[in-house]
C-alpha cells in the first residue's frame, strides 16, 4: 500500500502472494522487514500485549457506537548507523476485532475464487502454526468477511511518521476522523481507500504519546469527544524509568488477572533478548553483594540442567506467530479471540475462547515478544536481573536544547503531545464554566455552546440599553416635576400664604411622612401630614399625574393629623422606591 514502509499483498489470489504471506508469518530472518527493529537510543516503552489488547477491547465495548475493530500502531525507530538517521516507524502493536452487529453487513461482494483464496491463506497459516497437525474443517463453509480480511492484512503494515493515515495523525498530534464513503475516498490515503472498498464507512486515527489508535466501523459514525477522552485516559501515560515493561498496577483496574505480581513478563519484555542474562553482566559493579552470588549460582545451575530446553525455547520464540493459536479450519467462529504474538509463555492461557452469548468474532494480533524462559522457575532470577540492570546502567543525561526555559520549574520542557493535552484540558474547563453560566443551552457540543453564549450576551446588552434609556426618561420627568414645584404658575402667592399660616400655627406643627412599599407593579402608599389646605385632594391629584391606578384608598383624621393610605398599581411607567417617594413628596407637599 502507498505510504507504508512494508506490507504483504494479501489482496491478490495468486500462489506467489500466498507463499509471501506464509513467509511473512513464519520466517525468522524476514520478520524485521514487517516490523522495524526497536531503536537503541532512546528506547521506547514496550507494552504488554495482554494489557494492550484489553485496553482496545475495553475501548470498543464501552463505546456507544458500533466499532468493528481497533488497532494500536506503536512507535519504533529505524536507526541507520551509516547516515545517523533515526526514522520513526509506526508498526502493529496489537488489535482487537469485534465484527459487525448487523448480519446484513457481513455479506461479501467477493467472488468464489477470492473467498477460496482467503480460506486457503488462513488454512495454510493455521497449518504452519499448528505444526502440521490436522485441524477440524467444521467452519470451512463460513466466509471470511471483507472487514475481517482488511483487519488481517493490516497486521503486515507499518507507516513512516507523517506518511499514511496513522503517520499523519502522529506527526501532527491530531485526530483524523473520516466519516462516510466520500470522506474515505477523498482523503488521498490509500489505506482509507482500501478500507472503503472493504466495507468500512468510518475510520478514525487518534494520536497518543506512544503511538496511534485506529478504529474502523461499517457504519457512518459522527465525531465523538467522549471517544477521544477515553482514548486519552487509556493510552496516554508516562513510562518513566528504565523498565520497558508496563505493570498492570499502573492502570486503574487489573487488566491481566491471569498473571500475579511475580510474573517476570510484566518486568522484562525486551523483544530481542529471549535467553538468560550472563553472570558477568548481572554482577557488574556489584561483586560484593550476596544477592549477586545467589544469582550466579542460579544461572550456572540453570545453564547446566536446562540448556537444551532454553535453546528450544529460543528457536520457537523467534517466530512471529504462536503455535498454540488455531484458526479452526481457517475461519473465525462465534466469540473467538485469536492472538498472534511471539511469547511462548502464552500457552498458559487458551488462545481461542468460545461462548454462547456473543455471535461476533474477535480477532487480535500482537507483535510484542516477551521472555521465553520458564516463568515459575526463573521469576526470582529475572527480578534480580532487573534490579542489577537498573543499578549498573545510570540514566543518560539528555543535552539541553537552546531556547526558552521550561515553565513552572520543570527540568525538561513538555513535548508537543503533553502540551497539547494540557491545552485541551484547560480549554475544556473553560467550556464547562461557560456552560454553567449560559442559562439555555440548545445542544451540548462546543459550537452550539458558543452560539448560545453569544446570543445570551447580545440579549443582556439589549436589556442594559433599555434599562439605561428608561432611567434617562424617568430622570427627565423627575427634573420636570421639580422645576414645576419650584416655578409653579399662579401658585407662588398661595404658597407664601400657606407658609405664613403654618408659621402662625401652633408650635407643635406636624411634619409630612410618606412611606412607600413596592411589590412588583403594585404599590402600598401611606401619607401622614397635617389636615390643612386639603392634602387629600393633592394626594389624589398626584396619583393621577403619575399614572397610578387606585385599587383601594382610605383617609382618617385625628385632631390635626391626617393619615392617608392607598393601594395602587403602576401604569405605563415603572418607579422604584426612591423615585416614587420623591415624586409624591413633590406633588403632595409642594405647598405644605
Curated annotation (Swiss-Prot):
Biased composition regions of type Polar residues, renumbered to the chain: 352-361
Matching Gene3D superfamilies: Helix-loop-helix DNA-binding domain
Ranges where the bHLH domain occurs: 411-460
UniProt induction comment: Barely up-regulated by jasmonic acid.
Observed phenotype of the null mutant: Minor effect on jasmonic acid response and no effect on glucosinolate biosynthesis. Myc2 and myc3 double mutant has an increased insensitivity to jasmonic acid. Myc2, myc3 and myc4 triple mutant has no jasmonate-related defense response, is devoid of glucosinolates and is extremely susceptible to generalist herbivores.
Localization: Nucleus
Result of changing residue 94 to N: In atr2D; dominant resistance to 5MT
Biased composition (Low complexity): 278-293
GO MF assignments: bHLH transcription factor binding; DNA binding; DNA-binding transcription factor activity; protein dimerization activity
Basic and acidic residues bias spans: 294-306, 408-422, 468-482
Compositionally biased intervals (Basic residues): 398-407
Gene Ontology annotations for the cellular component aspect, listed alphabetically: nucleus
Primary location class: nucleus
Domain of life: Eukaryota
UniProt keyword terms in alphabetical order: DNA-binding, Nucleus, Plant defense, Transcription, Transcription regulation
Biological processes per GO annotation: anthocyanin-containing compound biosynthetic process; defense response; extracellular ATP signaling; positive regulation of DNA-templated transcription; regulation of DNA-templated transcription; response to jasmonic acid; stomatal complex development
Tissues showing expression: Constitutively expressed in roots, stems, leaves, flowers, and seedlings.
Stretches the record annotates as Disordered: 261-313, 341-361, 393-422, 465-508
UniProt domain comment: The JAZ-interaction domain (JID) (82-141) is sufficient for interaction with MYB proteins and most of the TIFY/JAZ proteins.
Subunit structure: Homo- and heterodimer. Interacts with MYB28, MYB29, MYB34, MYB51, MYB76, MYB122, MYC2, MYC4, AFPH2/NINJA and the JAZ repressors TIFY10A/JAZ1, TIFY10B/JAZ2, TIFY6B/JAZ3, TIFY11A/JAZ5, TIFY11B/JAZ6, TIFY5B/JAZ7, TIFY5A/JAZ8, TIFY7/JAZ9, TIFY9/JAZ10, TIFY3A/JAZ11 and TIFY3B/JAZ12.
PANTHER family in the record: MYC, TRANSCRIPTION FACTOR MYC3
Function: Transcription factor involved in tryptophan, jasmonic acid (JA) and other stress-responsive gene regulation. With MYC2 and MYC4, controls additively subsets of JA-dependent responses. Can form complexes with all known glucosinolate-related MYBs to regulate glucosinolate biosynthesis. Binds to the G-box (5'-CACGTG-3') of promoters. Activates multiple TIFY/JAZ promoters.
The protein, known as: Transcription factor MYC3
The species this protein was found in: Arabidopsis thaliana (Mouse-ear cress)
Amino acid at each position: 500500500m502507498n505510504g507504508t514502509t512494508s506490507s504483504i499483498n494479501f489482496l491478490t489470489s495468486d500462489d506467489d502472494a500466498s507463499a509471501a504471506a506464509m513467509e511473512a508469518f513464519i520466517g525468522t530472518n524476514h520478520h524485521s522487514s514487517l516490523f522495524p527493529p526497536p531503536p537503541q537510543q532512546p528506547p521506547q516503552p514496550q507494552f504488554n500485549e495482554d494489557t494492550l489488547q484489553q485496553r482496545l477491547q475495553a475501548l470498543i465495548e464501552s463505546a456507544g457506537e458500533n466499532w468493528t475493530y481497533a488497532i494500536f500502531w506503536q512507535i519504533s525507530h529505524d536507526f541507520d548507523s551509516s547516515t545517523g538517521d533515526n526514522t520513526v516507524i509506526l508498526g502493529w502493536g496489537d488489535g482487537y476485532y469485534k465484527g459487525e452487529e448487523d448480519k446484513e453487513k457481513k455479506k461479501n461482494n467477493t467472488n468464489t475464487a477470492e473467498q477460496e483464496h482467503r480460506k486457503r491463506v488462513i488454512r495454510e497459516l493455521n497449518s504452519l502454526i499448528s505444526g502440521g497437525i490436522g485441524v477440524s474443517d467444521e467452519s470451512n463453509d463460513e466466509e471470511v468477511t471483507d472487514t475481517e480480511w482488511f483487519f488481517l492484512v493490516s497486521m503486515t503494515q507499518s507507516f513512516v511518521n507523517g506518511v499514511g493515515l496513522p503517520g499523519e495523525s502522529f506527526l501532527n498530534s491530531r485526530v483524523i476522523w473520516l466519516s462516510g464513503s466520500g470522506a474515505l475516498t477523498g482523503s488521498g490515503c490509500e489505506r482509507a481507500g482500501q478500507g472503503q472498498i472493504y466495507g468500512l464507512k468510518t475510520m478514525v486515527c487518534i494520536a497518543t504519546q506512544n503511538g496511534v489508535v485506529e478504529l474502523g466501523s461499517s457504519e457512518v459514525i459522527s465525531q465523538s469527544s467522549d471517544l477521544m477522552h477515553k482514548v486519552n485516559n487509556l493510552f496516554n501515560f508516562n513510562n518513566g524509568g528504565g523498565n520497558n515493561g508496563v505493570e498492570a498496577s499502573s492502570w486503574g483496574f487489573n487488566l491481566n488477572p491471569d498473571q500475579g505480581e511475580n510474573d517476570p513478563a510484566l518486568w522484562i519484555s525486551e523483544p530481542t533478548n529471549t535467553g538468560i542474562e550472563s553472570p558477568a553482566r548481572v554482577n557488574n559493579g556489584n561483586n560484593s553483594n550476596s544477592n549477586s552470588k545467589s544469582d550466579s549460582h542460579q544461572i550456572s545451575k540453570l545453564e547446566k540442567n536446562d540448556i537444551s530446553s532454553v535453546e528450544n525455547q529460543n528457536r520457537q520464540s523467534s517466530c512471529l506467530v504462536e503455535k498454540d493459536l488455531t484458526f479452526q479450519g481457517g475461519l473465525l467462529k462465534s466469540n473467538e479471540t485469536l492472538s498472534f504474538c511471539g511469547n511462548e509463555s502464552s500457552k498458559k492461557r487458551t488462545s481461542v475462547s468460545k461462548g454462547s452469548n456473543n455471535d461476533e468474532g474477535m480477532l487480535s494480533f500482537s507483535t510484542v515478544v516477551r521472555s521465553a524462559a520458564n516463568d515459575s522457575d526463573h521469576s526470582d532470577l529475572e527480578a534480580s536481573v532487573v534490579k542489577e540492570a537498573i543499578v549498573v546502567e545510570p540514566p543518560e543525561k539528555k543535552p539541553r536544547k537552546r531556547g526558552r526555559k521550561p515553565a513552572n520549574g520543570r527540568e525538561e520542557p513538555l513535548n508537543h503531545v503533553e502540551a497539547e493535552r494540557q491545552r485541551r484540558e484547560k480549554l475544556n474547563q473553560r467550556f464547562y464554566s461557560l456552560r454553567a453560566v449560559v442559562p439555555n443551552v440548545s445542544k451540548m457540543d462546543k459550537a452550539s455552546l458558543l452560539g448560545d453564549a453569544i446570543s445570551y450576551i447580545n440579549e443582556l446588552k439589549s436589556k442594559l440599553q433599555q434599562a439605561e434609556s428608561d432611567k434617562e426618561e424617568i430622570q427627565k420627568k423627575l427634573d420636570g416635576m421639580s422645576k414645576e414645584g419650584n416655578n409653579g404658575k399662579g401658585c407662588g402667592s398661595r404658597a407664601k400664604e400657606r407658609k405664613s399660616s403654618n408659621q402662625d400655627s401652633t408650635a407643635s406643627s406636624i411634619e409630612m411622612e410618606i412611606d412607600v412599599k413596592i411589590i412588583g407593579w403594585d404599590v402600598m402608599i401611606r401619607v401622614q401630614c397635617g389636615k390643612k389646605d386639603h392634602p387629600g385632594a393633592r394626594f389624589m391629584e398626584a396619583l393621577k399625574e403619575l399614572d397610578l391606578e387606585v385599587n383601594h384608598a382610605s383617609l382618617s383624621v385625628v385632631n390635626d393629623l391626617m393619615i392617608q393610605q392607598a393601594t395602587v398599581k403602576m401604569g405605563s411607567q415603572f418607579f422604584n422606591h426612591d423615585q416614587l417617594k420623591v415624586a409624591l413628596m413633590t406633588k403632595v407637599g409642594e405647598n405644605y
